[in-house]
Amino acid sequence: MDRRRLPLLLLCAALGSAGRLSARPGNEVNLLDSKTIQGELGWISYPSHGWEEISGVDEHYTPIRTYQESNVMDHSQNNWLRTNWIPRNSAQKIYVELKFTLRDCNSIPLVLGTCKETFNLYYMESDDDHLAKFREHQFTKIDTIAADESFTQMDLGDRILKLNTEVREVGPVSKKGFYLAFQDVGACVALVSVRVYFKKCPFTVKNLAMFPDTVPMDSQSLVEVRGSCVNHSKEEEPPKMYCSTEGEWLVPIGKCLCNAGYEERGFACQACRPGFYKASAGNVKCAKCPPHSSTYEDASLNCRCEKNYFRSEKDPPSMACTRPPSAPRNVISNINETSVILDWSWPLDTGGRKDVTFNIICKKCGGSSKICEPCSDNVRFLPRQTGLTNTTVTVVDLLAHTNYTFEIDAVNGVSDLSTLSRQFAAVSITTNQAAPSPITVIRKDRTSRNSVSLSWQEPEHPNGIILDYEVKYYEKQEQETSYTILRAKSTNVTISGLKPDTTYVFQIRARTAARYGTSSRKFEFETSPDSFSISSENSQVVMIAISAAVAIILLTVVVYVLIGRFCGYKKSKHGTDEKRLHFGNGHLKLPGLRTYVDPHTYEDPNQAVHEFAKELDASNISIDKVVGAGEFGEVCSGRLKLPSKKEISVAIKTLKAGYTEKQRRDFLGEASIMGQFDHPNIIRLEGVVTKSKPVMIVTEYMENGSLDSFLRKHDAQFTVIQLVGMLRGIASGMKYLSDMGYVHRDLAARNILINSNLVCKVSDFGLSRVLEDDPEAAYTTRGGKIPIRWTSPEAIAYRKFTSASDAWSYGIVLWEVMSYGERPYWEMSFQDVIKAVDEGYRLPPPMDCPAALYQLMLDCWQKDRNNRPKFEQIVSILDKLIRNPSSLKIITNAAARPSNLLLDQSNIDISAFRTAGDWLNGFRTGQCKGIFTGVEYSSCDTIAKISTDDMKKVGVTVVGPQKKIVSSIKTLETHTKNSPVPV
């Protein structure tokens, strides 16, 4: 054979394929790419007549350089080709990609003893380019390279191109650079291209945090990289990700929030445009300026009000700017002697606000001064003078026959900010002539056997000129059946013609031009006996003496009472405080600590709903479709569009028509609970609708639904790191609930919702009502029904629910996640589950479950609740596993498992199986029965020896049935070992 013709054929076979090379991924950094080098490669060939450098063009007529070797006729070939020195930059792990063609030795005549179909790849590390001469012993072998496809002479004739691509790893390397070498031992091979590269995690932006180009350190662990927030943002939680050895970013934690005045656009925080604003940090869009406000700058925190429009300190930035109201209208006065009722109409313009109130200014006009002056403090306004919310007021205790002016101001929340003149309506009135007020005190100045001298003061409110006084008197024993009236012009009178030693009753009233006033209260005075007469002077002395004696007695009593109360107060003060603390509102709030408040402690459940849940307008909610049915009504998906906010997807629970008050209270009870929580791993309550029908609870929408069904649908499709990330989110949410003092009681994968970003959130806080209709709560105790498969032993036996019982339930959720949604305890009855757990049996580890995670399950299932981990500890454990993923590669060893594990399908009678079909049906894998028909695995004895590779060969390629069959085989092996041996 012509040795110089064969290289040309090899080159032709290779160049046609070189142009169809795919673009390299973005996480690969080339250290060498022979296709990109212009001119000769200049690699060293040893011996010099071995490898030969050939020039050519690809299908795009781009020049490329290749090396080939085709000395297949001679024995003991040892032809070496060494590259130039390649700097490694920052890489520790190097990848070598070879593209080559190789001739099938069978297609070359007379070379069966000398022709080879492989070649060898070597490397040597060096800190500099000093290797002038080739020394074979200095190189370390990487691998022997063989072709997946080799070509023949017929392929060349048909122009069938067979280009091989092989990639090998080198490293870790530590020196500054290295050489590659290729050893030919007798193959007909053409080296079309050599690409040397390393992998990096490329620069990326995640959750508004920038992560730089990162090169993996080694092949065993992830590199934790701290992100930096993009411009105009700040950390909410320190952002970090992990760089894998494959150059992939994993497990994003934390995020950044755009500053006030900036919104998230793409992967950056961009300034709000003119006409838009954002008042606080957060990843929400800038809002359009509300009515009567504007902004002309970028990055506005709020919008400035137009001229004569204002925003009060209590108004949120999203509220429209408003102005003071116009004046009240149509004032009407209704005068009744010394009182007046004022009525008016609402202003035509309320200024755009609902907090309009009215103030009354009263002015007294006329008299000696021609200027009006403020009314005296004696004038009263009913119900009050300022802050009126209704359009009527009654003014009493005015002076009779007096001119008054009343100014009615209309004000609202921004009136104090305006410099414009007051907006008021005025009305002037004159009060009528009125009766005088009653005389309050009548004094006895002198008595005799047949007369009494009386005096009094003018009425406090004469309401005009007093014309005279009417004095009415009669004997007390006559009971007003016969009385006498006399009139006096002054404020004193002497009444004569009375009987000695007789008690008389006196009443006096004043008269003005209007009429008589009301009579005074009744005063009783007694005339003197026949032989006794007291002057007014002596009478005063006697009265002073009596008054002094009475005062001393009263003072003694008061001092005694005060001393007793002071002592009693000191004794009871502590106890009173304790009662106040204990019986306040059914709960105690400590300063600086947010605690859960049980809505059932409220006498009025509606108060709890209004306190913790936001009332939504039903017009802002649109329902798209019904996605399910709940206990009280339908569950829908829809959209919520609040004013000045972006439309969001929501889940909507509705209360069906014809509900009872108890059903409504139970329905809204869950909202009262949810509304108290604010955590990224707790389902967020958007609000409730209670003022219209149907009554609704609106929450954030979780695209992937419940975690258990999601995992069953995506069986074996996630990495362990992704599953641990989900579990970490659940644990973080439960830590938050535990810190608030809330016990969930129904923690299960079916009550965990998962969104499109694989973020898990704890939901379903209506245990007290839901469990009554939950099919998983078929075991009844004294207090109702509880989900047996997820509930701790002490909660089942004593209904003792604590955060420790939630930790037990978390262990079951952990088992559900790692088994991709399998049902805990499978088909065991509730009584069998209770008995097995009480006897110390625990669930076995799921298939391929990391030992660290199964140990965490067992810790959560400690019988003594005090030995179970707290959720804070669980979060810490999962964080450590995420930071050190190599620890998750240790799978639970079947031989090292505890002996007290429950077997899957433990209630199946294995002895009843006679054929493989019976066995597969018994373990719920009957769909595989047809595959095993007619093959060597047709009996139980042979099928018990099947491996995962064997299953793939016969067609069982789906992971779910594979897992069930493997679990069934373990059960069959256990049964076989424990079965008696026939004799």
UniProtKB/Swiss-Prot annotation:
PROSITE patterns: EGF_2, EPH_LBD, FN3, PROTEIN_KINASE_ATP, PROTEIN_KINASE_DOM, PROTEIN_KINASE_TYR, RECEPTOR_TYR_KIN_V_1, RECEPTOR_TYR_KIN_V_2. Its EC number is 2.7.10.1. One of its GO terms (molecular function) is GPI-linked ephrin receptor activity. ATP binds at residues 628-633, 653, 700-706, 750-751. SUPFAM superfamilies: Fibronectin type III (SSF49265), Galactose-binding domain-like (SSF49785), Protein kinase-like (PK-like) (SSF56112), SAM/Pointed domain (SSF47769). Heterotetramer upon binding of the ligand. The heterotetramer is composed of an ephrin dimer and a receptor dimer. Oligomerization is probably required to induce biological responses. This is Ephrin type-A receptor 3. It comes from Gallus gallus (Chicken).
